[in-house]
Amino acid sequence: MALTAALKAQIAAWYKALQEQIPDFIPRPPQRQMIADVAKTLAGEEGRHLAIEAPTGVGKTLSYLIPGIAIAREEQKTLVVSTANVALQDQIYSKDLPLLRKIIPDLRFTAAFGRGRYVCPRNLTALASTEPSQQDLLAFLDDDLTPNNQAEQKLCATLKQDLDSYRWDGLRDHTDKAIDDALWSRLSTDKASCLNRNCHYYRECPFFVARREIQEAEVVVANHALVMAAMESEAVLPEPKNLLLVLDEGHHLPDVARDALEMSAEITAPWFRLQLDLFCKLVATCMEQFRPKTTPPLANPERLTGHCEELFELIASLNNILNLYMPAGQEAEHRFPMGELPQEVMEICQRLAKLTEMLRGLAELFLNDLSEKTGSHDVVRLHRVLLQMNRALGMFESQNKLWRLASLAQSSGAPVTKWATRVVRDGQIHVWFHCVGIRVSDQLERLLWRSVPHIVVTSATLRSLNSFSRLQEMSGLKEKAGDRFVALDSPFNHVEQGKIIIPQMRYEPLMDNEEQHIAEMAAYFRQQVESKKHLGMLVLFASGRAMNRFLEHVTDLRLMLLVQGDQPRYRLVELHRKRVESGERSVLVGLQSFAEGLDLKGDLLSQVHIHKIAFPPIDSPVVITEGEWLKSLNRYPFEVQSLPSASFNLIQQVGRLIRSHHCWGEVVIYDKRLLTKNYGARLLNALPVFPIEQPGVPEVIVKRKAKQTAKQSGRKRR
């Protein structure tokens, strides 16, 4: 479809009307360019897909929503906007789309959250009830559906009142009641524990109400994990050919896809025996009480017993083999180099894939048959069997996916990482097997790039080291296929608004020097606090260990510090905002997750402290296998893995400072490698153009280290 004059006029009219809705709106050339590029892509006028980097201040959300809605209406398609996390998803749903509704009055939009974000009304009813008979009935369906105490029951009763009176839509993020994770895990549900259409609460269930709203919406706000799952199962969202898809925070997509395709399952022999025995009993119950129309051959007791016996013997053999690779009786991990399994293990995995597929098919057959019997049997007993069969199906599906992946030598042209772990819980040993592909470009090509006609991938940061090459390699997007890659200019004047400070540290932030380096960092940080130039500050660390060491050096400032983990992030940010707005000094302290999605303007954040260049950890099985593979191709892992990742992290960290034309301040980076190493200049060149200063650092004597040195020299003298 070409961009008609009428369509261009509609987009221009909405953009002009938007300017009247936003106080102090500043027209920005990069925003107009993004609107044009997005419109050309979604209308199919230019290229297949578009990857567009839109730095902070461009206004990327509205820049894709305006042309996206206009083209979706013209083509009678659904615009799906996907984000990396629930917080950003909720911001678009609760803030940006309601703003657009002021200029597009009949705009219909909804949000698609994962099942686990919604309350299950069946579980809520059980936990809110004070009637023993009601609790007994629901406890029969699920053993964990009785309240632990009176306070829990009262909270659940309040939530139920809010849900019943439509004051609450059932989404965890939309209630002002504090619900801890332990309680929420019992209030929500998962696919394996959901009765779906067979549930008494199906029509009013918040999850299914939200799913039905998707069919009527023009705009659906989802997240990457849900989109990947929906494309795999062809459920939830409209058909791919009827979609316009925008992937915001698109730099997360390869990792989300890899996480979605990672398979792990417990293979402890006694546990596995128990699961198989329970399944055999469940099949026997179905045959006796809910006889299916046609009897599957595998449901024959003797045949099913023999099938499960072979499966168990293979699992037991695999346990014995894996135990040879790990120290006896203790927690351990073994990774198979380059993902290459011994021939014997590979043959076991291939056979397990076939056997678990047959059990998966049997469980699915019984589940479908049971779902058709809800009007002719005791509902409570039937529902209990339905739940148990649904969980059995979930287990066999997971096992089957695991063994199929384990049977592959490669995925997307790269090895599949394979490893086993042994953990000890409550004195009991548990063995797990894990598989994940180190590249997911083929899967993304199949699920997204080839299925959806036109997709926009956007983020404030898509490049690393001024290049899209890492994104292209990890995602499978490529210019040869007609994909376009655009990097917009920042609308801010970084030279005038801020500067980078690299203190003259005596030590590099390496493990051997960590104590001395953090002591120096703490001394310079203290100096900055005492100068009282900045009300709002942020300190970012690459590891929790380093953050805790730093806190030991600034215990006298602890009341000023709002540390990640003390409270939920949104509460820390709320408290920080209140402090600064009342004229108090406040310091947020956190890890890399605080370098993303934190939008604090002006005095709320005028100084950012960065502990060191955040290279990715090198002890992950996936990273190690990728390194082995790259070396086998004569590629340098530091150049392909570590440096692009570090560049990306640094760009995000530095990007916390200048969020508007009125922002100002400094970014302090406590890592002299930016000036002393060859790669330092490349990392700096990828950052916004700030002037750089190199002040001195107060001299620090590290007492702890001095004591250790004295002890060591004492030993030598003796």
Regions found by a protein language model. Name each.
Residues 2-20, 26, 76-78, 83-218, ...:
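A substrate-engagement module of RecA-like helicase motors
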Residues 44-66:
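Walker A/P-loop
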Residues 64, 70, 90, 94-98, ...:
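Signature of the SF2 helicase/ATPase Hel1-core->accessory helical subdomain module
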Residues 78-87, 456-460, 535-542, 669-670:
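Conserved RecA-like ASCE P-loop NTPase motor core of nucleic-acid helicases/translocases
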Residues 185-218, 228-237, 366-506, 517, ...:
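A contiguous, basic/glycine-rich beta-loop/short-helix subdomain that forms a polymer-engagement track
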Residues 251-277, 452-527, 552, 560-564, ...:
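Metal-dependent catalytic core segments for phosphate chemistry
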Residues 503-515, 566-675:
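Conserved RecA-like P-loop NTPase helicase motor core
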Residues 542-566:
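Conserved helicase motor "Helicase C" RecA-like lobe of SF1/SF2 P-loop NTPases
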